[in-house]
Amino acid sequence: AKRVLVLGDNTGEAVFDRLLIEHFPRKTGIFYAAKSAPVINDVTAEEAVDSGIDKVAAIIPNGAAIPGTVLSKCSSEFIEIFNTAEVVISKGQGNFETLNEEQRKIWFLFQVKCPVIAKYYRFGLGDWLLLEKEQGRLACS
């Protein structure tokens, strides 16, 4: 892929996100989306810089200060990158809950923490999932 977008989740995971991104091919244009302002424990753009992500990816605030990624609340710059990235890696259950209805291909990486989500999708509570969503369908990997 020439363009990859990683949607960050928890502040504490940003260090591990950097380690993951360091293994992407160097020719790849990598964008790391973070919150524009503090929300619960989600990583902000400033915290992403503190974690060193700016050394391996272009950090882009998503333009919203709400849980998950609600595209109608995000900045036009974020939307442009979201729509043109060849690969989108979405971390965290909140991002899954707000993006799983989108029609584009998205890879979701998260731990199932909510009994309602577990029951509705028939996941086990506490399961770690890597899901590929393409053309409106989810597939477990």
Segments from the language model and where they lie:
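Conserved nucleotide-cofactor-binding alpha/beta core module
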Residues: 1-3, 14, 21-64
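Active-site glycine-rich loop that binds ribose-phosphate moieties when present
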Residues: 12-19, 23, 70-74
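Gly/Ser/Thr-rich loops at beta-strand to alpha-helix junctions
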Residues: 9-18, 37-39, 93-97
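C-terminal functional extensions of proteins
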Residues: 40, 47-141
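Short, contiguous strand/loop micro-motifs
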Residues: 7-8, 65
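Short beta-strand/turn micro-motifs composed of small residues
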Residues: 8, 34, 110
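Well-ordered, non-transmembrane segments within structured domains
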Residues: 4-5, 14-15, 19, 110-111, ...
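Structural motif
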Residues: 3-5, 86-87
